[in-house]
Amino acid sequence: MARVKRSVNAKKKRREVLDQASGYRGQRSRLYRKAKEQTLHSATYSFRDRRAKKGDFRSLWIQRINAASRAQGMTYNRFINGLKNAGVEVDRKMLAELAVSDINAFNSLVEVAKANQPQNAAA
């Protein structure tokens, strides 16, 4: 059996890990073991935060809709409920975009929501 020297492959593997860790601070960008640990953690954080980003954007959309609807004298939950009762199927992303870019269209949706409020909402 021929002897296998692994120097080339080992150096290539280490170089790839160090290249991935090139922007990190201190030992995490220079030492192989620290760089390997950090790149594994970084991949975990990336995976987690790609999923958290979806909820973050939904929260941002809700804040924008709430601010715009309160400017028209209506709370967010009453606005969404009024749209649901009216059968308007516009998602929060589109509502937030309307609130930012086309306030007249958003105001017309607020009027639709006000017209479709339950009569005993205060009781």
UniProtKB/Swiss-Prot annotation:
Biased composition range(s): Basic residues: 1-15
NCBIfam families documented for this protein: rplT_bact
UniProt cross-references to Pfam families, sorted A to Z: Ribosomal_L20
An annotated GO cellular component: ribonucleoprotein complex
Record's function text: Binds directly to 23S ribosomal RNA and is necessary for the in vitro assembly process of the 50S ribosomal subunit. It is not involved in the protein synthesizing functions of that subunit.
Organism (species): Cutibacterium acnes (strain DSM 16379 / KPA171202)
UniProt xrefs under PROSITE patterns: RIBOSOMAL_L20
An MF annotation (GO) of this entry: structural constituent of ribosome
UniProt keyword annotations, A-Z: Ribonucleoprotein, Ribosomal protein, RNA-binding, rRNA-binding
Similarity section: Belongs to the bacterial ribosomal protein bL20 family.
Gene3D superfamilies membership: 6.10.160.10, Ribosomal protein L20
HAMAP family found in the cross-reference section: Ribosomal_bL20
GO biological process, one term: ribosomal large subunit assembly
Cell division recorded as keyword: no
Region of interest called Disordered, as start-end residue ranges on this chain: 1-23
Name of the molecule in the record: Large ribosomal subunit protein bL20
Cross-referenced InterPro entries: Ribosomal_bL20, RIBOSOMAL_L20_CS, Ribosomal_protein_bL20_C
